[in-house]
A protein has these predicted regions:
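Active-site phosphate-binding strand-loop segment of PLP-dependent enzymes
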Residues: 85, 187, 191-243
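Conserved PLP-anchoring active-site segment centered on the Schiff-base-forming lysine
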Residues: 152-173
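Active-site C-terminal subdomain of aminotransferase-like
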Residues: 237-240, 247, 252-357, 370
Length: 439
């Protein structure tokens, strides 16, 4: 019997065997309700109208941009207006043939990381093609452009001790992640604003390592960076330039080298990031730059070192795509014509297209719930697949449809899209005048 104090509870007094048969005191547990935490998080995005629902589709070889939609009611034909296979190269016979031949020759996977048996001859050929494309000494292939941006920017900051990154305010999430993971200093300059950029550069010591990180084509607004002016500032203030050309490679320039090639300033850019998954229609990402930079990233970047390399068939398909687009300008010319035509037709229909000089066609909605409603009705009623673009991909209040015309979209496809959008805009509570004012 306990004397001179409070009585112990059953939990405090009970003893149970420990790991080695010795008793230990039982303590009261207040477990975290993990399921509730996750369900609450999901409820928040549901309530904001930005819960993402994936459309289950199957692309049909030779029929792009047509696809088959799978849902509980069966399989139905759809026209895809939101693919990032911008030129349709994912369906090109040369790409498919190269991939089939690689699989038949060497099998499916690479068999290892790049350091441990995963550097196949296909990877070596691919990096040589990319270095040639950008007229650089070297290139380095990653499993995705997100990984390439993330691990390269983080590694640059770790290698350049005391460095600071100057980042455009509209940079992609992969660049933001890399800058954050680098753990160094950063400053953000106003979008495409060289006056603001110079003000920030001028405030830094000349001897301090500096990296200017920016994109050529910004994927949500379609704006294009003043690359020449930014490179001139980099030279003036002793900074490295890191340019993301993900939404430009394959699609701009005489050989598909991107906006920097188109503008004649590729040689002024220190590091170019690109993708193999958009203009080239396959998968993967890369950087291209000097031999020393690429070798340093190869040797230090965890996102490159500690992962299995791309499948040989993917590398083979990418090589075929790059080689084709280096000599063929037909896809690029048709792509630009289709983008101009779609913008003109949407504007003529009174729809609030965000004007820009690139192939991106954003149509402003400004409300996440309405944006989702419009895209659902496009898909269910008209067989037109457009994915809604909501926060955090774009700022709240700027929710939009992001249309991506390809060389393979026909005038008839545009007729159906414009007619459907006009009808839905009249039906949904979207004020065109308000949205025009918001541009």
């Amino acid at each position: 019997m306990q004397r001179g104090g409070r009585r112990k509870s059953r939990l405090e007094g009970a003893a149970t065997p420990g790991a080695h048969g010795k008793p230990h005191e039982m303590v009261e547990r207040h477990d975290m309700d993990y399921a509730r935490a996750f369900s609450d998080a999901l409820a928040r995005i549901h309530s904001e109208g930005r819960y993402r629902v994936f459309a289950d589709i199957s692309r049909t070889r030779g029929a792009f941009p047509k696809a088959m939609r799978h849902d509980p009611e069966g399989v139905r034909d759809v026209t895809v207006w939101c693919s990032n296979d911008y030129l349709g190269m994912g369906q090109h016979p040369a790409v498919l043939t190269a991939m089939h031949e690689a699989i038949d020759k060497v099998g499916a996977g690479s068999g290892g990381t790049r350091n441990i048996s995963g550097t196949t001859h296909y990877h070596v050929e691919l990096e040589a093609e990319l270095a040639d494309l950008h007229q650089k000494e070297a290139a380095l292939v990653f499993t995705s452009a997100f990984v390439a941006n993330d691990t390269t920017l983080a590694t640059l900051q770790k290698l350049l001790r005391g460095s600071i990154i100057l980042s455009d305010e509209k940079n992609h999430a992969s660049m933001i992640a890399g800058i954050r993971n680098g753990g160094g200093d950063k400053t953000v300059f106003a979008h495409n604003d060289v006056v603001d950029l110079e003000r920030k550069l001028a405030a830094l010591p000349r001897e301090r390592p500096k990296i200017i990180a920016f994109e050529s084509v910004y994927s949500m607004d379609g704006t294009i960076a003043p690359i020449a002016a930014i490179c001139a500032l980099a030279k003036k203030y002793g900074a490295l330039t890191y340019l993301d050309e993900v939404h430009a490679v394959g699609m701009y320039g005489p050989r598909g080298g991107g906006i920097a090639e188109r503008d004649g300033v590729m040689g002024e850019v220190d590091i170019i990031n690109g993708t193999l998954a958009k203009g080239f229609g396959v998968m993967g990402g890369y950087i291209s730059g000097s031999r020393h930079i690429c070798d340093a990233i190869r040797s230090y970047a965890p996102g490159f070192i500690f992962t299995t390399s791309l499948a040989p068939a993917i590398a083979a398909g990418a090589v075929a795509s790059i080689r084709h687009l280096k000599v063929s300008g037909l896809e690029r010319a048709r792509h630009q014509e289709r983008a101009r035509t779609l913008k003109r037709r949407l504007k003529n229909a009174g729809l609030p297209v965000i004007d820009n000089p690139s192939h991106i066609v954003p149509v402003l909605v400004g409300d996440p719930v309405i944006c989702k409603r419009v895209t659902d009705m496009l898909l269910d009623r008209h067989g037109i697949y457009v994915q809604p673009i909501n926060y955090p991909t774009v700022p709240k209040g700027t929710e939009r449809l992001r249309l991506t015309p390809t060389p393979l979209h026909t005038d008839a496809d545009m007729d159906r899209l414009c007619a459907a959008l006009s009808a839905l805009w009249a039906e949904c509570p979207v004020s065109l005048e308000q949205k025009r004012a918001a541009e």
